[in-house]
């Protein structure tokens, strides 16, 4: 009976340890995903800013061409 009791405690202990390790890895993976999403969001906003700058320059150039044509 004592042998079965020790075996049962050993199995439960090992199960809890493996469960703890799995939870720790799961949390780490979630944190990594959150960091990746934040980095992707920042890159996307930088790309948008760059695109808006280009659009502003093009509109400004077209506007100045339009003014020149009106003067002639």
From Swiss-Prot:
Tissue expression summary: Expressed by the skin dorsal glands.
Chain positions with Leucine amide modification: 65
Pfam families assigned to the protein according to its UniProt record, in alphabetical order: FSAP_sig_propep
Compositionally biased intervals (Basic and acidic residues): 38-47
Bridged cysteine pairs (disulfide): none
Cell location: Secreted; Target cell membrane
Chief location of this protein within or outside the cell: secreted
Region listing for Disordered, in residue ranges: 27-47
Propeptide: 23-49, 69-72
InterPro entries attached to this UniProt entry: Frog_antimicrobial_propeptide, FSAP
Signal peptide start and end residues: 1-22
Keywords: Amidation, Amphibian defense peptide, Antibiotic, Antimicrobial, Cleavage on pair of basic residues, Immunity, Innate immunity, Membrane, Secreted, Signal, Target cell membrane, Target membrane
Post-translational modification: Amidation is essential for antibacterial activity against Gram-positive bacteria.
One GO process term, biological-process aspect: defense response to bacterium
GO cellular component, one term: other organism cell membrane
Role, per record: Amphipathic alpha-helical antimicrobial peptide with weak to moderate activity against Gram-positive bacteria, and no activity against Gram-negative bacteria. Probably acts by disturbing membrane functions with its amphipathic structure. Strongly inhibits the formation of NO by neuronal nitric oxide synthase (nNOS) at micromolar concentrations. Acts by a non-competitive mechanism, probably by binding to calcium/calmodulin and as a consequence blocking calmodulin attachment to nNOS.
Record family assignment: Belongs to the frog skin active peptide (FSAP) family. Aurein subfamily.
Protein known as: Aurein-2.2
Protein source organism: Ranoidea aurea (Green and golden bell frog)
């Amino acid at each position: 009976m004592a042998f079965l009791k020790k075996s049962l405690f050993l199995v439960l202990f090992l199960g809890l340890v493996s469960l703890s390790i799995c939870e720790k890895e799961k949390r780490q993976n979630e944190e990594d995903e959150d960091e990746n999403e934040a980095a992707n969001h920042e890159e996307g906003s930088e790309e948008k800013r760059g695109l808006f700058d280009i659009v502003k320059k093009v509109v400004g150039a077209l506007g100045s061409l339009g003014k020149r044509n009106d003067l002639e």
